């Protein structure tokens, strides 16, 4: 108790000495020519933190009903602006995109130097960010690169179908999310390193379990509200231990990638080495020779690979699992999708990337999953690099900007019956998710749009098609299971709280 009293007194003293003058100044800014966006009145010290209960995106959406689609909040010492409409998202991400092109960096990322070289956190006008962005766009996610790796994706889809068929033949229930995670991880590691890290059958494999735990924990802890972000004066103490936890999981992923790099560097020195058609060789070529790019350091390559691993395996697998949840909960939608796939594929078992444009109901289903279960409900928080006027309000420099995409997906003024899963809403509509239709921006928009969108989109369509075309499904647990299927856990990616367990039946 004595320690708690001392800590509380120290906290109050620090606030009045360091924070109160800034807080008072920001309050005085409300007035002609410098009015901040409307928002709930903040309390001393904590600001609006106590008004945020439960998942942040849901709390923000509720407050926006009162204060509007451009809302200001005081989260401790942090000034934040929450955007909750396509019109305001257009202002922030497109019309004034340069002013909001930097990421808001959480304290927990300030470890292992990740904040300095990650493509997710580097300033958008930095040489490093432009270099990494260009390499990813031209060497990994370009149309030509995706065409060259189509065979790898088809092989991973065949392995997925074979794995599910094994459960079907044995009449066993399977963890669908675990299978989709393994598929995406297998694809990512094949693309990066020409290896198969995971094994569908080895559910107790140390590599399988540890790798998935590192990735899932990393994305989970990033989404945890952190007192070190609200009150940076306490950041050195890491009071919730979030930086320490992320450091452990991030460090393990970095160590694994470093071992891959060191092994490849040794192999490349041998006179008998045969070049591999993977991304690591491409990055090392650039590091050693330039090839028209600025040189990449080994540190940049290491962190770049970790960024790809986390984004490529976790969010895509989670979105595929959500798609299967909704299709199993809506047998009529599943029947429509299966009929379209049967008509187009015939006796073929797999969809190719070039087939997607010819399957309108499959496309509509994936769009509706993006709307109904956005992987990143707040997208990637931005930071204002300069003071900017938006819709008559002042957005101060260094303000944290959060685009509440989840709120837009539940807005009845945008979507009819927003709480219903209806792929049909997209049929015959010219709405895509590539960053120009701001009512549907699961990958973001502008300079910070997710560079892996082309690959993620192809795999999502193809995995869902593989699972639905080749198998019927029975959900485990009956009515009780159905009630729990939509429960989620907030984080960098919106994960299912309970895994989807279902029995596949060979068609």
From Swiss-Prot:
Residues that hold heme according to the record: 450
Keyword DNA-binding applies: no
Any GO MF annotation of the entry: oxidoreductase activity, acting on paired donors, with incorporation or reduction of molecular oxygen, reduced flavin or flavoprotein as one donor, and incorporation of one atom of oxygen
Enzyme class: oxidoreductase
Keywords from the named record: Heme, Iron, Membrane, Metal-binding, Monooxygenase, Oxidoreductase, Transmembrane, Transmembrane helix
Catalysed transformations (reactions): 11-hydroxyferruginol + 3 reduced [NADPH--hemoprotein reductase] + 3 O2 = carnosate + 3 oxidized [NADPH--hemoprotein reductase] + 4 H2O + 4 H(+); miltiradiene + 2 reduced [NADPH--hemoprotein reductase] + 2 O2 = miltiradien-20-al + 2 oxidized [NADPH--hemoprotein reductase] + 3 H2O + 2 H(+); ferruginol + 3 reduced [NADPH--hemoprotein reductase] + 3 O2 = pisiferate + 3 oxidized [NADPH--hemoprotein reductase] + 4 H2O + 4 H(+)
Functional pathway: Secondary metabolite biosynthesis; terpenoid biosynthesis
Keyword set includes Heme: yes
Lipid bilayer topology: Single-pass membrane protein
Pfam hit, one: p450
EC number from the UniProt entry: 1.14.14.61, 1.14.14.-
Gene Ontology cellular component terms for the protein in this record: membrane
Cofactor(s) the record lists: heme
Record-linked PROSITE patterns: CYTOCHROME_P450
Localization, UniProt: Membrane
UniProt note on tissues of expression: Expressed in glandular trichomes of young leaves.
UniProt record, GO biological process: terpenoid biosynthetic process
Transmembrane segments: 6-23
Residues forming coiled coils: none
Task performed by this protein: Monooxygenase involved in the biosynthesis of carnosate, a potent antioxidant labdane-related diterpene natural product. Catalyzes the oxidation of 11-hydroxyferruginol to produce carnosate. Mediates the conversion of miltiradien into miltiradien-20-al. Also involved in the production of pisiferic acid and derivative products from ferruginol.
Similarity-based family: Belongs to the cytochrome P450 family.
PANTHER family associated with the record: CYTOCHROME P450, FAMILY 76, SUBFAMILY C, POLYPEPTIDE 5-RELATED, GERANIOL 8-HYDROXYLASE-LIKE
Name of the protein described by the UniProt record: Carnosic acid synthase
């Amino acid at each position: 108790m004595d320690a708690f009293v001392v800590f509380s007194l120290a906290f109050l003293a620090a606030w009045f000495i360091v924070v109160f003058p800034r807080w008072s100044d920001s309050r005085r800014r409300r007035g002609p020519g410098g009015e901040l966006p409307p928002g709930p009145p903040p309390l001393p010290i904590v600001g609006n933190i106590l008004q945020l209960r439960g998942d942040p995106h849901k709390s923000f959406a509720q407050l926006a009903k009162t204060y509007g689609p451009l809302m200001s909040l005081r989260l401790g010492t942090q000034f934040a602006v929450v955007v909750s409409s396509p019109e305001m998202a257009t202002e922030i991400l497109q019309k004034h995109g340069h002013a909001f092109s930097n990421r808001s960096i959480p304290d927990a990322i300030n470890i292992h130097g990740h904040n300095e070289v990650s493509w997710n956190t580097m300033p958008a006008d930095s040489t490093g960010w432009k270099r990494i962005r260009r390499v990813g766009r031209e060497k990994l996610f370009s149309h030509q690169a995706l065409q060259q790796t189509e065979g790898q994706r088809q092989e991973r889809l065949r392995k997925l179908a074979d794995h599910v068929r094994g459960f079907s033949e044995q009449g066993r229930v399977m963890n669908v999310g675990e299978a989709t995670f393994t598929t995406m991880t297998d694809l990512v590691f094949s693309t990066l390193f020409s290896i198969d890290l995971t094994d569908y059958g080895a559910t107790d494999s140390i590599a399988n379990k540890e790798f998935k735990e590192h990735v899932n924990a990393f994305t989970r802890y990033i989404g945890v509200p952190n007192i070190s972000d609200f009150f940076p004066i306490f950041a050195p103490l890491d009071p919730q231990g979030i930086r320490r936890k992320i450091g452990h999981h991030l460090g393990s992923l970095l160590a694994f990638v470093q071992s891959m790099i060191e092994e490849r560097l040794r192999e490349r020195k041998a006179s008998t080495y045969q070049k591999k058609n993977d991304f690591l060789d491409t990055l090392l070529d650039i590091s050693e020779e330039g090839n028209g790019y600025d040189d990449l350091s080994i540190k940049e390559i290491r962190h770049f690979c970790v960024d790809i691993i986390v984004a490529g395996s976790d969010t895509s697998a989670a979105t595929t699992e959500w798609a299967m949840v909704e299709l199993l909960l809506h047998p009529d939608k599943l029947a429509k999708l299966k009929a379209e796939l049967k008509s187009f594929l015939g006796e073929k078992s797999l969809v190719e990337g070039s087939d997607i444009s010819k399957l309108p109901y499959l496309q509509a289903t994936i769009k509706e999953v993006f709307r109904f279960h956005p992987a990143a409900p707040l997208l990637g928080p931005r930071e204002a690099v300069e003071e900017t006027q938006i819709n008559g309000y002042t957005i101060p420099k260094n303000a944290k900007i959060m685009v509440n995409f989840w709120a837009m997906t539940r807005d009845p003024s945008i979507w009819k019956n927003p709480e219903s899963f209806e792929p049909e809403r997209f049929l015959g509509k010219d709405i895509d998710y590539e960053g120009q239709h701001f009512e549907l921006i699961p990958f973001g928009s502008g300079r910070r749009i997710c560079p892996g969108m082309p690959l993620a989109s192809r795999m999502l369509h193809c995995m869902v098609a593989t699972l639905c075309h080749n198998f019927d499904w029975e959900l485990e647990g009956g009515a009780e299971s159905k009630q729990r299927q939509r429960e989620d856990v907030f984080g960098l990616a919106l994960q299912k709280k309970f895994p989807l367990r279902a029995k596949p039946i060979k068609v």
